[in-house]
């Protein structure tokens, strides 16, 4: 009887005692670096939806190992961030304490499921030896002018008590801005922040996507997020203000002749410098009323100032408008209502002139066409008119071609406690000083209260004076009291695993790292990077995946790494939904706990079922009946050993099935078609059940494949074969094409074109042999009774058709 609990407990101990998953560098083998997006260790533990990606990488890593690769497949913990801190505040516990408890629980769960991780390589972003190097990278960014402080308008979430990056803000169905985490209201607020100049790498971040084997949807999301626009910078003089101009960016310079107004964002420099200082109370009140509400209503106010059209010299009104973004372009837009939907809505609202400059039947018209009302552009198409307009602007010093990006520099400060401290000091004049490498890491001080301040003052402001105001060389300094965002540690963790490869004697969970900037580290990076396969959710497309690429490109720039991209291939797994076909959540009560299933069905059943559910990238509902069906398949494999004799003799009847099995599973694994691999295992086992004896080598190689999915059961059956080597140490045999050339063919028999029978014949059997066989079958005989056979139609190796009357 297949007792999964006894089998899994037995082999877990043997594997642990023999340390079969302990990684060793072997440069005589090709390397294969495969990685999961490391998890945040929440207090809830893992549910089956979390582990789908881990199961996929486990299967691939075992397969690559069986093919002779030197496979690196580590795991770690992304443990800083808001969730831990929120939980700490709610329970009045320190986040460090329960974070470690959660990590221990996650590790135990992963071990139960039989993953082949070497836990000596485990990384923890909250460990001081780890974030020392996060701080070191920040220092290098600052030294290369890629980190700076600025007073900028930020996304402020009062409930979370922190600033959020643009990538962390969503828009709800009512047009309100909300936080990605918790769906709390987000408003705009001006604060002094640390910012990383990700825009310096914008072109590389777009151009290098072409070389990556990533889903096209993820590439498109990153391209659209960066949103490179080639357009024109155009200068408009202000009628009432001498020597003052408003610069606008437009990707449609060809529509300049259709500009009938200018629209400014609420915090455009001229709003602060001139319009507000004119003591226009209506404008002040308008800004106050509309700054809180983030929704676009196409509301505006006339400033009573006019701009002078750079070509026609016509005066056009200047408005403030709620649809103008301060952080895109210049914060000023030339309104062309006839050829822009937003400008059209605004112009209709305020009865502004609509000037068509492209011939069309209906406006607003946004496509290509013949230009009209445009002086030297009349008769030209869009591209021709754009180039001619830019040339005119350049010649008359009124503007020039310009490249613009939607991507903003990354706001890198968080007003929270549970994050990496900045390696920065300020003197009494607010001059910035970086700590020396020897002074890293900067550790978090112990606080009794780390609740966020709703006014934006970070919890670290409550630290003791010794931490907050260190004295160095008899000079008093002030520490930075913001912390880094939760994304910081995950920007480089794929390198951190490699920094542990030179100290493989450390125990599970120890955190000793080689220096990131050492020659030995460079040697390891050159050998193992980039990651060959990265698996994780598509929700990280413009967050972690973009940030990690940015940091890696910077590390390439300063010659820490040689390659330009961290992840060669990316796969996004789909979700496992609850049995009610909705996303698993505690509130819905549809979470499937793997710990319960390990006890009731076994880890092997869970692993095999999850991989058998369907395509990896599909989101599919959990089905308990299908889980039970997978369990029955594993029982069928187990029982085979009592049904057939397994020996060293060659069973010619299985040659085709065996070699076809090996060929197909390799093809399916190359394409990450795990469900089809399980199907092929079922087909091969069915073929084995038709035999009285099966070759031991064939069964051993089947067990190697089974071990990718059900390692415990496979190892138990391998021991029954008395094989001296554990499956994880074996190599998978290659198929032989010679056995895949079939010497037989299936021929169907029809009567008057209606199908009756099929039978297997030797290849190229002649008509007489085939006809004699079918004419002697009872079914055919009955159909021919009292009938006359008038004709036989025979197509060699395919079909025979008897025509009767």
Curated annotation (Swiss-Prot):
Binding locations of ATP? 586
What this protein is called in its record is: Leucine--tRNA ligase
- GO molecular function terms attached to this record: aminoacyl-tRNA deacylase activity; ATP binding; leucine-tRNA ligase activity
Q: Which UniProt keywords apply?
A: Aminoacyl-tRNA synthetase, ATP-binding, Cytoplasm, Ligase, Nucleotide-binding, Protein biosynthesis
* Localization terms from the record: Cytoplasm
Span of the annotated motif 'KMSKS' region: 583-587
Q: Describe the family membership recorded for this protein in Swiss-Prot or TrEMBL.
A: Belongs to the class-I aminoacyl-tRNA synthetase family.
The gene is leuS
Identify one Pfam family in the record. tRNA-synt_1
GO CC term, one of those recorded: cytosol
Question: Which biological process annotations from GO are given for this protein?
Answer: leucyl-tRNA aminoacylation
* Record PANTHER family: LEUCINE--TRNA LIGASE, MITOCHONDRIAL, LEUCYL-TRNA SYNTHETASE
Species of the source:
Mycoplasmoides gallisepticum (strain R(low / passage 15 / clone 2)) (Mycoplasma gallisepticum)
């Amino acid at each position: 009887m297949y007792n999964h609990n006894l089998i899994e407990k037995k082999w877990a101990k043997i594997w642990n005692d023999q340390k079969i998953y302990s990684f060793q560098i072997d440069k005589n083998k090709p390397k294969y670096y495969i990685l999961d997006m490391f998890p945040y260790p929440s207090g809830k533990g893992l549910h089956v939806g979390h582990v789908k990606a881990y199961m996929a990488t486990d299967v691939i890593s075992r397969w690559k190992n069986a093919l002779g690769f030197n496979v690196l497949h580590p795991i770690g913990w992304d443990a800083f961030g808001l969730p831990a801190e929120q939980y700490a505040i709610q329970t009045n516990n320190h986040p460090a304490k329960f974070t470690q408890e959660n990590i221990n629980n996650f590790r135990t769960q992963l071990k139960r499921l039989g993953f082949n991780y070497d836990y000596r390589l485990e990384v923890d972003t909250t460990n001081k030896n780890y974030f020392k190097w996060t701080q070191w990278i920040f220092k290098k960014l600052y030294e290369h002018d890629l980190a700076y402080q600025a007073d900028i308008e930020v996304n402020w979430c009062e409930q979370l008590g922190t600033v959020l990056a643009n990538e962390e803000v969503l828009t709800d169905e009512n047009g309100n801005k909300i936080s990605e985490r918790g769906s709390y209201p987000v408003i705009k607020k001006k604060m002094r922040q640390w910012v990383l100049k990700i825009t310096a790498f914008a072109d590389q971040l777009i151009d290098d996507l072409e070389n990556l084997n990533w889903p096209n949807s993820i590439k498109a999301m990153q391209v659209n997020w960066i949103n490179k626009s080639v357009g024109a910078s155009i200068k408009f003089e202000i009628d009432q203000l001498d020597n003052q101009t408003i610069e606008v960016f437009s990707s449609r310079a060809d529509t300049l002749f259709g500009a009938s107004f200018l629209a400014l964002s609420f915090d455009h420099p001229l709003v602060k410098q001139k319009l507000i200082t004119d003591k226009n109370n209506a404008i002040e009140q308008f800004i106050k009323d509309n700054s809180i509400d983030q929704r676009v209503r196409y509301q505006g106010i006339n400033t009573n100032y006019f701009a002078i059209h750079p070509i026609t010299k016509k005066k056009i009104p200047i408005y403030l408008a709620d649809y103008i973004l301060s952080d895109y372009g210049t914060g000023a837009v030339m309104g062309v209502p006839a050829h822009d939907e937003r400008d059209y809505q605004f112009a209709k609202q305020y009865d502004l002139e609509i000037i068509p400059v492209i011939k069309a039947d209906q406006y607003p018209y946004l496509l290509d066409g013949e230009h009209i009302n445009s002086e030297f552009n009349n008769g030209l198409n869009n591209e021709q008119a754009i180039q001619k307009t830019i040339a005119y602007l350049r010649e008359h010093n009124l503007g020039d071609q310009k490249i613009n990006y939607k991507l903003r520099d990354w706001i890198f400060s968080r007003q929270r406690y549970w994050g990496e401290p900045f390696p920065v000091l300020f003197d009494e004049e607010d001059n910035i000083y970086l700590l020396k490498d020897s002074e890293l890491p900067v550790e978090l001080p112990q606080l009794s209260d780390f609740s966020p301040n709703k006014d934006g003052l970070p919890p670290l402001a409550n630290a003791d004076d010794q931490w907050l105001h260190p004295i160095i060389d008899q000079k008093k300094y002030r520490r930075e009291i913001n912390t880094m965002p939760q994304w910081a540690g995950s920007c480089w963790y794929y390198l951190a695993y490699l920094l542990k490869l030179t100290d493989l004697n450390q125990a599970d969970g120890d955190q000793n790292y080689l220096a990131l900037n050492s020659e030995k580290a460079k040697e390891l990076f050159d050998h193992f990077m980039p990651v060959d396969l990265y698996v994780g959710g598509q929700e990280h497309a413009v967050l972690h995946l973009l940030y990690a690429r940015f940091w890696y490109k910077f590390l390439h720039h300063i010659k820490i790494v040689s390659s330009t991209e961290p992840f060669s291939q990316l796969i996004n797994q789909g979700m496992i939904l609850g049995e009610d076909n909705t996303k698993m959540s505690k509130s819905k009560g549809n979470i499937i706990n793997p710990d319960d299933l390990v006890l009731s069905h076994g880890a092997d059943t869970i692993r095999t079922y999850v991989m058998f559910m369907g395509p990896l990238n599909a989101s599919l509902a959990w089905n308990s009946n299908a889980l039970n069906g997978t369990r029955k398949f594993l029982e069928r494999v187990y029982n085979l050993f009592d049904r057939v004799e397994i020996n060293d003799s060659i069973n010619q009847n299985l040659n085709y099935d065996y070699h076809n099995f090996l060929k197909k599973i390799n093809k399916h694994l190359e394409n990450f078609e795990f469900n089809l691999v399980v199907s092929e295992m079922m087909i091969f086992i069915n073929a084995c059940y038709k035999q009285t004896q099966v070759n031991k080598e064939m069964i051993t190689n089947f067990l190697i494949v089974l071990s990718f999915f059900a390692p415990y059961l496979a190892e138990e059956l391998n021991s029954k074969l008395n094989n001296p080597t554990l499956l994880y140490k074996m190599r998978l045999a290659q198929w032989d094409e010679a056995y895949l050339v079939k010497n037989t063919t299936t021929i169907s028999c029809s009567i008057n074109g209606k199908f009756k029978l099929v039978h297997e014949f030797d290849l190229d059997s002649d008509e007489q042999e085939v006809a004699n066989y079918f004419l002697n079958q009872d079914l055919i005989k009955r159909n021919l009774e009292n009938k006359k056979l008038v004709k036989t139609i025979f197509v060699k190796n395919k079909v025979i058709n008897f025509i009767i009357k």
